[in-house]
Structures are given as C-alpha cells and as structure tokens.
C-alpha cells in the first residue's frame, strides 16, 4: 500500500538549522604521567528528531606508540511513531501506524591513519538493561568488562548503560574503519501474550466503532514499550588509534537514526479487524554529522551534516 526508501544524501556544510553546544575541556590524570583530555559535543536536529551527545576522550600516554581516542555516543533518537488515516477511495476504514522497527547507530572514518580497535557492545544482547565497561591500562591496553562496576583494575574506564525493552542490540557491520549497530524490535508482551516483532497484528486492536480515529485502531500508549512510544537513548563506545606524526586532523561521520515499519489496520464490519505490514518501509532515516578531530590541539569541530 505504501513503500518508500530514503537513503542518506551527501553530507553538506553547515547550512540547515541545527543546535550545537560545546562543553569545557576536562583533563584527568590517570597515572604514570598519562592523562585523558575530555571534550563533548552536542548536536541536535529537529528535522531528524535526533540529538547527538558525543564524548571525545583523548588518551595521552607516552608508553603507547599511537594516539588514542575513546568516543562515547549518547543522546536521543525520537521514535517518530505516528497514527494516521489512509487517504483514497475505499480506504475510509483503513488506518496506519508508523513505528521504529530498528534504531541505527554508527561511526565511520576514511582516514588511512586511523583504525577502529575496540567497541561496545560487541555481541548480540537481548537483556532489557545493557551495561558494559571499556577499560584502559597504561601502554595502550584496551579491555572490556561485562558489566558496570568492573573497572577497578583499569587506569581509566568508560561505561555504557541503556534500556532496550522488547528490542535487541546487534553489530550489523564492523571493520577497521567503521562500526554500525542495529537495535532491533524482538518480542513484545501484549494483553494477548507474547508476540514476535514480525507479527502483522502486533499493536493492532479493534476500535469501538467504524467512526473511530486512527489512534483507536492501535494499542494505547501504556501498552507500548518506551522505544516505540517515545524513543531511544543510545550509549555506545568506539576506540580508535591514530598513527603519531601522520596527519594533524581526522574526520569521522557519526550517524543516529531509525528504520520504520508501517502497520495497516482495516475494519471490516462483518469480519472484524484485518492487519497488513510493510517491513522497512522507510530505512536509514539517519542524522549524519561529520566531526573533525585535531590530534595535537584536541579540538573538535562540526564540519557538516545531512
């Protein structure tokens, strides 16, 4: 009934309205003459319904033969869930719900002198609450711990913590230049029992009558998990190394967004409600921001966005 795919366009210089803020530099001594220089960038887009809160932690360690950067990606991705009538003759009793089947988070660089050496989370995670720690020890040793609190043996550590009720986290793509995660709809608890995310009757209910609004054809807000009803608060980490003495600056693209499904509900007065589903009706609805990192001055610049 409705199919559309929107791909991310070219990253343009700053032109369209976004909100940007920068936090003050914070320096933490981590022992043995090493220190971590911390920067934070906040970039928001009303167009995409996304806020990127990105922490850039530069590790200065004379015992490590490379520059190191820990990037923690936080913020908010609005679900953009909506309910509407389907226009056209013969569709008067058909309503639709557009909702996020998947949230997308990713980091990419094309710099030949930069390598992605660690990231969190790594494996498929099905628990509602996600918590992991990335630790650093003097000399360039990065390690991950399974849960928050396991950081006593590290000179420095960063944690991730987020909630994903009814969703699972997976690494969709990973290599030395990029990592992309998908937080995907999995299984939902409904008044009728557990339902797969692929069940076409998921969220569909019978309205009180044929004159009901589009919202009445679908489950009320108190039956929708937070990632459907409001949105997702990501918390992901990547660790990058940079060849010392090569380039002064590197660029990274960080993307937050969603893939949207459409569920159609049609009321037939004699037989009742009928559901149809368009999986991945809108994909890669992502806000992509290009950041420039200066390895010498430890400055961060927002260079462009879509």
UniProtKB/Swiss-Prot annotation:
<dbReference type="Pfam" id="PF07968">
    <property type="entry name" value="Leukocidin"/>
</dbReference>
<keyword id="KW-0964">Secreted</keyword>
<dbReference type="GO" id="GO:0090729">
    <property type="term" value="F:toxin activity"/>
</dbReference>
<comment type="similarity">
    <text>Belongs to the aerolysin family.</text>
</comment>
<keyword id="KW-0800">Toxin</keyword>
<comment type="function">
    <text>Part of a bi-component leucotoxin that acts by forming pores in the membrane of the target cells. The activity of LukEv-LukDv to rabbit leukocytes is similar to that of the Panton-Valentine leucocidin (PVL). LukEv-LukDv is hemolytic to rabbit red blood cells although the activity is only 8% of gamma-hemolysin.</text>
</comment>
<dbReference type="InterPro" id="IPR016183">
    <property type="entry name" value="Leukocidin/Hemolysin_toxin"/>
</dbReference>
<feature type="signal peptide">
    <location>
        <begin position="1"/>
        <end position="23"/>
    </location>
</feature>
<keyword id="KW-0732">Signal</keyword>
<keyword id="KW-0843">Virulence</keyword>
<dbReference type="InterPro" id="IPR036435">
    <property type="entry name" value="Leukocidin/porin_MspA_sf"/>
</dbReference>
<protein>
    <recommendedName>
        <fullName>Leucotoxin LukEv</fullName>
    </recommendedName>
</protein>
<dbReference type="GO" id="GO:0051715">
    <property type="term" value="P:cytolysis in another organism"/>
</dbReference>
<dbReference type="InterPro" id="IPR003963">
    <property type="entry name" value="Bi-component_toxin_staph"/>
</dbReference>
<keyword id="KW-0354">Hemolysis</keyword>
<comment type="subunit">
    <text>Toxicity requires sequential binding and synergistic association of a class S and a class F component which form heterooligomeric complexes. LukEv (class S) associates with LukDv (class F).</text>
</comment>
<keyword id="KW-0204">Cytolysis</keyword>
<dbReference type="GO" id="GO:0005576">
    <property type="term" value="C:extracellular region"/>
</dbReference>
